[in-house]
Every structure is written in structure tokens, then in C-alpha cells.
Amino acid sequence: MANEVFNSSLFVIGTYLFLGTLYLVFIPLGLYFWMNTRWNYMGKIERLLIYSLVFLFFPGLILFAPFLNLRMNGQGDV
């Protein structure tokens, strides 16, 4: 009985860690990559979808904001 509770607790903790990592790390990084490559070529519907995903995954995006630069190439002095 105690072993079942321990195993189910580990499963729940592992699931929370997996979903938290997915929400805070992997999906925001994929979203940054998508925005960086498609920013100048997006249509209206795609841009609306991206804006809604930015709203949904804002906590993860704000974690990576200090480390990523989304300025266009060729801006500024060399």
C-alpha cells in the first residue's frame, strides 16, 4: 500500500515537472524561434495565433527575454 502511494506520488511529481518544463522552457523557445524566422512573412491569421500564444506562454517568454535578441539583421553599426 505504501509503495503504491509512493509510486503514484512520484508519477504526479514527474508529470508536474514535465509539464512545467514544457510550459516554461521548450514551448517558449520554439515560439521565439518561430517568431524570429517568420516575423516579416506572417499573414494575419498566423500573427493572431502567435499573439495569442505569446499571451498564453508569457511566463516562459519573460524568462528568456534578457538572453535573446530579436532585432533585425543589419541594424546598427558594425
Swiss-Prot record:
Membrane topology: Multi-pass membrane protein
Keywords, comma-separated and alphabetical: Membrane, NAD, NADP, Plastoquinone, Quinone, Thylakoid, Translocase, Transmembrane, Transmembrane helix, Transport
Catalytic activity, as annotated: a plastoquinone + NADH + (n+1) H(+)(in) = a plastoquinol + NAD(+) + n H(+)(out); a plastoquinone + NADPH + (n+1) H(+)(in) = a plastoquinol + NADP(+) + n H(+)(out)
Cellular component terms (Gene Ontology): plasma membrane-derived thylakoid membrane
One term of GO molecular function: oxidoreductase activity, acting on NAD(P)H, quinone or similar compound as acceptor
Pfam families documented for this protein: NdhL
Domain of life: Bacteria
Residue intervals passing through the bilayer: 10-30, 48-68
Chief subcellular location: membrane
Family that this chain belongs to: Belongs to the complex I NdhL subunit family.
Job description of the protein: NDH-1 shuttles electrons from an unknown electron donor, via FMN and iron-sulfur (Fe-S) centers, to quinones in the respiratory and/or the photosynthetic chain. The immediate electron acceptor for the enzyme in this species is believed to be plastoquinone. Couples the redox reaction to proton translocation, and thus conserves the redox energy in a proton gradient. Cyanobacterial NDH-1 also plays a role in inorganic carbon-concentration.
Summary of subunit composition and partner proteins: NDH-1 can be composed of about 15 different subunits; different subcomplexes with different compositions have been identified which probably have different functions.
Protein name (database record): NAD(P)H-quinone oxidoreductase subunit L
Gene of this entry: ndhL
